């Protein structure tokens, strides 16, 4: 049997308010703080900040 994966899926939501999001994996034991990335949002055609939210 395969090992159980310790990573959790998190949703990175655009702060531009467009509703666009990305899904990433992170290990909660090694990365205790919330993720935030500056990535491209195609709805506003700019690089904006994406902040972590839990997947519902």
From Swiss-Prot:
Gene3D superfamilies named among the record's database cross-references: Ribosomal protein L33
GO cellular component, one term: cytoplasm
GO terms under biological process: translation
Keyword annotations from UniProtKB, A to Z: Ribonucleoprotein, Ribosomal protein
Single GO MF descriptor: structural constituent of ribosome
Cysteine pairings via disulfide bonds: none
Top-level lineage group: Bacteria
NCBIfam families in UniProt: PRK00595.1, rpmG_bact
Entry's family note: Belongs to the bacterial ribosomal protein bL33 family.
Protein name, entry field: Large ribosomal subunit protein bL33
Organism in which the protein naturally occurs: Rickettsia bellii (strain OSU 85-389)
High-level lineage: Bacteria, Pseudomonadati, Pseudomonadota, Alphaproteobacteria, Rickettsiales
């Amino acid at each position: 049997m395969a090992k159980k994966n310790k990573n959790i899926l998190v949703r990175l939501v655009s702060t531009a308010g467009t509703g666009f999001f990305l899904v990433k994996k992170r290990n909660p034991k090694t990365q205790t703080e919330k993720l935030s990335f500056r990535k491209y949002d195609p709805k506003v055609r700019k690089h904006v900040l994406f902040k972590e939210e839990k997947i519902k």
